[in-house]
Structures are given as C-alpha cells and as structure tokens.
Amino acid sequence: GQILLEGQRIDQLPHEQMRHIRGRKIGAVFQDPLTSLNPLYTVGQQLTETIQTHLPVTAAEARKRAISLLEDTGIPAAAQRIDHYPHQFSGGMRQRVVIALALAAEPKLIVADEPTTALDVSIQAQIISLLKRVCQEHGAAVMLITHDMGVIAETCDRVAVMYAGRIAEIGPVHEVIN
C-alpha cells in the first residue's frame, strides 16, 4: 500500500522531510492527553512553540493565535489559562488543549487515535463533537481511529475496517455498518 497526502506519497519520505509534514500538514490527537503534553511547560509555551516552528509569525502573533485556538476549543478564560501547566486542567480540558495543539499549524489532516478513551463517558461526546466542529471550521480532514462503532456511525462519512494490520473492508459508513 501507499500513503498519500495531497497527492504526494509520504510513506517513503526521509525522516527530515517527514518532520516538516508532521505538525504542519498532519496534526495528531492521541488517547491520553496527559502524556501528549509536556508537564514542564505551560500549554501556552507548547502551543506557541508549535505555531512558531511551522508558521512565519512573531512570538506575539503566536501567542494571540494560541489564545484563539484555546477559545475555539472551549477553554474558558483562555487568555489566563494559557499560562497554566497541563496538570492544572481536567482530562477533558487537557484533550481540548491537545486538539488546539493539533490545529496549531493549520494542518490539512488530523489523525485522532482513540481521542476519548481516557475520558469520562460524559465528556466523550463533547470531545467528538468539538473535534468535528473545529476541524470543519479550520478546513482539516479527520482520520478517526477507534473501536467505538457508535462514534463511527455518528461522526464518520467513510470507514475502513482493519484486521491483522490490513484493510478488510472499506466504504461509506452506512453500507459497511449494515
């Protein structure tokens, strides 16, 4: 198989070229938001570093964009919370920060690997809804990796069913699930 992004094959690119694609063209949201964030840095430091690494902006512009992303993802009092550390946020709020981080460099694709597994059931639907909304607003496609068929049925247009590392079935959600 091949992995194509915007018509370019990326599965055989050298490490250095992939480094430029990761973050800039592809963002990621992982299972556990606590391990996705560095506990030694504020969420603002992490967001602004990502923004400045991938976009030609000043530190002030990066901070303004970071606050805007936190607001977009539903972090209350984002201008103050930007200076907080990951441990000062709840699990759901940390996952919102991770989603903001994934969107920081305006990627074309967000890979969301079980983004709600580590969260309370009451927060899971909010996070899936948020991910869908902000990706639509920012023009990013989402590749959702999950075992939750309910989430797939409610969220996805197309689905690929994997078995033993291979695609066993692929197609529109309503056809594959039925």
What are these regions (language model features)?
Residues 152-154:
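A short, surface-exposed alpha-helical micro-motif characterized by mixed small hydrophobic
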Residues 10-27, 45, 53, 175-178:
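ABC ATPase NBD coupling module
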Residues 1-9:
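Conserved ABC transporter NBD signature motif
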Residues 125-139, 150:
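Helical segment within the ABC ATPase nucleotide-binding domain
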Residues 158, 170:
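Short, glycine/charged-rich "phosphate-handling" switch motifs in NTP-dependent
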Residues 104-108:
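A short, proline-enriched helix->beta-strand linker immediately N-terminal to the Walker B motif
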